Amino acid sequence: MTKNLLVELGLEELPAYVVTPSEKQLGEKMAAFLKENRLSFEAIQTFSTPRRLAVRVTGLSDKQSDLTEDFKGPAKKIALDSDGNFTKAAQGFVRGKGLTVEDIEFREIKGEEYVYVTKEEVGQAVEAIVPGVVDVLKSLTFPVSMHWAGNSFEYIRPVHTLTVLLDEQEFDLDFLDIKGSRVSRGHRFLGKETKIQSALSYEEDLRKQFVIADPCEREQMIVDQIKEIEAKHGVRIEIDADLLNEVLNLVEYPTAFMGSFDAKYLEVPEEVLVTSMKEHQRYFVVRDQDGKLLPNFISVRNGNAERLKNVIKGNEKVLVARLEDGEFFWREDQKLVISDLVEKLNNVTFHEKIGSLREHMIRTGQITVLLAEKAGLSVDETVDLARAAAIYKFDLLTGMVGEFDELQGIMGEKYTLLAGETPAVAAAIREHYMPTSAEGELPESKVGAVLAIADKLDTILSFFSVGLIPSGSNDPYALRRATQGVVRILDAFGWHIAMDELIDSLYALKFDSLTYENKAEVMDFIKARVDKMMGSTPKDIKEAVLAGSNFVVADMLEAASALVEVSKEEYFKPSVESLSRAFNLAEKAEGVATVDSALFENDQEKALAEAVETLVLSGPASQQLKQLFALSPVIDAFFENTMVMAEDQAVRQNRLAILSQLTKKAAKFACFNQINTK
């Protein structure tokens, strides 16, 4: 016979961004708790609102499964003394298992007998295990926690109720400073306290109190209501996934409505209006069928449709205040002079250990000069790049960006266009922030891409130089994201820029404001980002590519993919082993690897030397790999017929030189001795 378990924790309003991860964590930890306690179940469903986290287990076994475990103890010769009595070692072993020496038996393993005991544990009724759910709740982790009411413990928010039900059976458990009961709280304004009748009646009991406990149902309600408004008014409403997830975690009983604002505000750049609505007010944007922004918005209230007109007016009033600010800053910022703002950046600190933003821009400008040549920019692109690098942070001192920091770069583009700069310069100023997340949008223009790379590289090198290096998960200056951005842009544009050579060039630059330090750490940091970009590629293949001599990001990623693609083929293992053997022996070569044909003693070493001399890796990575693997029979024949470590030192070094030249060329693809073929 199975049962159903409900656990609900009622709290003060949770931050929206915490709700979904906490709900997921609760479900995962409950599943682990049940598994650990040998309780089978059919399904786990989680619930959440801003004021509660809950989990329900259905089809829960009414008792633990019985447990039978065998334990191996000391050898018989240690367990028995000369008189055949059990020694202290044997007695201590069984005592530790809660058994006696009478439970001992001997079993033979590989010709020697050992003490064994079998421990049987009869499963307890589920009612005896349920109190342990309190430990599940205590184990939840949160990004921030707090104290309240003079208590010593911490939790995400003060706890008000705890409900634990096994079908209809109530458990009055203690959690923090709360006594458990079947009482739960309804909607803060529309509902009241209610008793949950059973684990299976949970949603309906709360629904009567204007609480929709299932977030999936709340989400669908919001989407359906928005689509109904769309159909009624003939408009298009952008349902942004992140905004939808945030909004559903702000309400317990959602009701969507449409508000409006004066059309005069549409003269302000669209990005300002959208930011005001989405980022600051959590409103959905409304457009006409052609995609043109309309003077309307969609909001979702935490309640029903009663007095909705008053709610709409209140939301409109709040939004207008934001739009007034935007209109004011848009008008006033156009009076500013870009060169004046750039000069003022001398007084804006980039970081107290690094210097000003203006100094950061100057270093970035010098880096763009190097990159422009390596990326093959045209003369016009190079001119645009130089201009963009000279002014690209100016908008940080505009009123608009001061009020809406999400618009940095975006407003820079608009203000530079108004000032008569070229579209390429303006676009680069916007694009230099890209990507803003791990999978974020990348720059489209070459000028923007180079500026983005240069800006990020100076940021990375500057922070590393003053010892502000990320450790563990701690990365307060988002240097991992910046490095990932550099790697992604290089890969996307397919620029054959060797990162090791580029970093060497950057460390050779001279600045008045800063000297780059910690180059080795920077290189390791960049390699770690390339490693991450290789995704699920086997670790040994990653290590082989990263250990190679080619640090062109696009080439490295392509090489890893090529190796993975053929790793299951029959020829992969012997081909890699041949090259790997060559790599291992080549390490013994001394000095400059020159080959003297006069020292050849057989046709096989001559054949390998000629094959190596004519080897030129070219084309896509898959083709280069075929070229290398094609050498496998030649390498094998060389090893079968040639004693590499010959007694004659000159002959030995000559043979090692052949292998050294081979591996030097192969290492441009990967270090094959890092690949595991076992």
UniProtKB/Swiss-Prot annotation:
**Listed SUPFAM superfamilies:** HD-domain/PDEase-like (SSF109604)
Q: What is its main location?
A: cytoplasm
Molecular-function annotations in GO: arginine-tRNA ligase activity; ATP binding; glycine-tRNA ligase activity
Q: List locations, semicolon-separated.
A: Cytoplasm
- Under the cellular component aspect of Gene Ontology, which terms does the record hold? cytosol
Q: Please report which protein family the annotation says this sequence is part of.
A: Belongs to the class-II aminoacyl-tRNA synthetase family.
Q: How does it assemble?
A: Tetramer of two alpha and two beta subunits.
What is this protein's record name? Glycine--tRNA ligase beta subunit
Species for this entry? Streptococcus pneumoniae (strain P1031)
Q: What is the lineage of its organism?
A: Bacteria, Bacillati, Bacillota, Bacilli, Lactobacillales
